[in-house]
Amino acid sequence: MKWGRTPAPVSSAVDSGERILAWSTLRGRPEGTYVIATDAALYVVDTNPLRLPWDCVTKATWTDDAILVVEARPNRQAPDQVWHLSPEDLQRLPTVVYERVTSNVVVSEKVALEGDLGIRIVARRSGDDMRWTVTFDPGLNAEDPDLRRRAEEALADLRSTLGL
């Protein structure tokens, strides 16, 4: 994030009405590629532009060598996808990304299904609604009908308990 005027390619890449909070060019990418954090979404602007609303981002972490690893579920039925981004400027981006991802989480609950293995149920604000995601631990077969049934029951129980 540079101080001063936001470059036109950055401003024009975001949806109308969104406020740009932080941005950076990306290391090792052609000129004109950016990562942009707005009040509503994370953008990756390159040859194949991407907009990830914050309620779709399931996890965002930083590696020791300043690579932003974003896990997101852009489609409610799809599994998480992972993007590795190398911003050149880290002044505000790490703080903004952390704040935006965590501020959308309303509830996060771990439910055991088999021993220590289970699911993580997360509700995130999505406009006026809630976006619920259920993520199976590695080692559990998410296609197993019995496990899916138990996961759906756990989700229904949690929603009922919370009145959501």
What role is predicted for each listed range?
Residues 1-164:
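Eukaryotic intrinsically disordered, low-complexity regulatory linkers and tails enriched in Ser/Thr/Pro
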